[in-house]
Amino acid sequence: MPNILFVDGRNLMSKMSFILNPERVKEKKVDFAEYDFNSLLNKVLAGISVDKKLFYLGKLTVHEETTKKSKELIEEQRLLKVHLEAQGFEVVLAGHVRGHKETCPKGHETLTFKEKGVDVRIAVDMITLACQKAISMAIVASSDSDLQSAVRELRSQGVERIYLGFETQPNKGLSFTTNRTILIRNSEVEEFSCKQSASD
């Protein structure tokens, strides 16, 4: 039975963005369509055989209030998907990402995009594979607490479980429900960093 890596893409990239661009400088936005995810994960998972790598992303749709930004994000995701597939990942588009306008207390409108349903798809896929006896080990690259119930179910199905998180604010609940915890160091994220986009 295979060892499978489940990557919660938005969760992973959000954590990495904070490490690579902690001040949230717009001109230094990280271009993940150039990031060497494969080398990073090969390093932190050294000694562990990974037979399949699943990278989950929220499915983007164009919303009438956010048409321009939605189309930009869809193109960014297309480039990211091509980049990930070239590195041996199977990209799974799940749930949805919707843009909407929020008004702050001062009356300013902000365009916000929220992802929903990806964690549900990861949980369903893990449990389905476990019930089919089609998985030996699940490596969970996500710090989403909503996955704890699914990970507990994997335990009852006899599946080995590894939580892959970050040294900054690891998820204690996922650490508790897995056999092993591997934490990615900030220096390792930086080691395989893509060129940050700059508008010089």
Each PLM stretch: what is its role?
Residues F89-D200:
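Nuclease catalytic cores that cleave nucleic-acid phosphodiester bonds
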